[in-house]
Swiss-Prot record:
The gene is MADS16. The lineage of its organism: Eukaryota, Viridiplantae, Streptophyta, Embryophyta, Tracheophyta. Residues 84-174 form the K-box domain. This is MADS-box transcription factor 16. May interact with the K-box of MADS4, MADS6 and MADS8. May form a heterodimer with MADS4. Inhibition of MADS16 expression by RNAi reduces expression of MADS4, and transforms lodicules and stamens into palea/lemma-like and carpel-like organs, respectively. Its main location: nucleus. PANTHER family: SERUM RESPONSE FACTOR HOMOLOG. One of its GO terms (biological process) is cell differentiation.
């Protein structure tokens, strides 16, 4: 019982399509090798899958370029002539653009002005003025941007300086005050005689005969 006839149409499932392509490609390559060996033919095959993967086969006695050259000789035409002519036209167009730009540059530098008419000179002057305004605008923009950047750096440096000053000020403040027997209260400073007064304790008189006496330096008990 023979196999049923397969309808030739595009396989919608991508996986099935790729599997079928791989199998058929292998079969075509096998037939091409058989033709090369059995019939001494020059065969070239170039294939691209739907995913863009490239495959080729060429008889060992030649190469792809040789096959294309023989093909062009056989049909009497060139495969590259149209592309070559397009490249020539593109090159000529680019040369014209380059020549015009060089002429414009020289004219803006004050050269090659002898052949220009009044209207052309006036148009050139307007173009130069417009370019000058654009350059000035760009210059001022750069200056403004740099100035703002420098201001931010200066502000940041000043804030860091103030923070450092505050930290240093806190570190230099003494941890204790000392008693000033002269009635001045607490003093955070440290003089030459402050060490003796740092830990001064005042003795409160408890004897009746001591009531009413001034608390002078003779009634102070000092440590060390």
């Amino acid at each position: 019982m023979g196999r049923g006839k397969i309808e030739i149409k595009r396989i919608e499932n991508a996986t099935n399509r790729q599997v079928t392509y791989s199998k058929r490609r292998t079969g075509i390559m096998k037939k091409a090798r058989e033709l090369t060996v059995l019939c001494d033919a020059q065969v070239a095959i170039i294939m691209f899958s739907s995913t863009g993967k490239y495959h080729e086969f060429c008889s060992p006695s030649t190469d792809i370029k040789g096959i294309f050259d023989r093909y062009q000789q056989a049909i009497g035409t060139s495969l590259w002539i149209e592309q070559y002519e397009n490249m020539q036209r593109t090159l000529s167009h680019l040369k014209d653009i380059n020549r015009n730009l060089r002429t414009e540059i020289r004219q803006r530098m004050g050269e090659d002005l002898d052949g220009l008419e009044f209207d052309e000179l006036r148009g050139l002057e307007q173009n130069v003025d417009a370019a000058l305004k654009e350059v000035r605008h760009r210059k001022y923009h750069v200056i403004t941007t740099q100035t703002e950047t420098y201001k931010k750096k200066v502000k940041h440096s000043y804030e860091a300086y103030e923070t450092l000053q505050q930290e240093l000020g806190l570190r230099e403040e003494p941890a204790f005050g000392f008693v000033d027997n002269t009635g001045g209260g607490w003093d955070g400073g440290a003089g030459a005689g402050a060490a003796a007064d740092m830990f001064a304790f005042r003795v409160v008189p408890s004897q009746p005969n001591l009531h009413g006496m001034a608390y002078g330096g003779n009634h102070d008990l000092r440590l060390g």
